Amino acid sequence: MWQKKRPDLCSTLILSGFFLALPVQAITDYGGFRDGDVRFFGEVVNAACAVAVDSQDQTVLMGQVRSNSFTDLGEWTDPHPFRIKLEDCSTNVSQNVGVMFSGETDGKDLLVFRTGNGAGAAEGIGIGITDATGQLIIPNTAPARYAPIQEGETVLHYTARYRSTSRTVKAGNASAQVWFNLFYQ
């Protein structure tokens, strides 16, 4: 009886070893182990438009501004334009779109976003955003104005500007991070 089961046990062990070795062999046949990573980010939305890929993560270059160019509270620098491009828009779903910009506001001026963070941050300055008509967009507030949606593609134009929030502006990092959300009517 012992003799009869022994070949079955040996066969099982040999076959197990063969199957365990297959994935290793398959990996080495295709050039070795993993050499890199590809990550895919996306979202399925139920909205009138989709945000174009090049508008999802933007960098607006604000440039350098001399701290002594501000002589009083509430002064603005030159505007820096940016846009939000919407694709695959359908006016059958909604007729208008508005944008809410969110982020940390400046403690001295709630109409602009806080700039800099930590050691080396600029002080006495924030970033304000205006729409295509030049109206200041109040941070963290539902849209006050809506733009008509164009069938297919809609482009929303904005400008960003530094604004002094103190009579004295201290030089340093004046970057900010702001998010946007679309609202439809």
Which stretches of residues belong to each language-model region?
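Mature extracellular/passenger domains of Gram-negative fimbrial/pilin and adhesin proteins
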Residues: 2-11, 17, 22-185
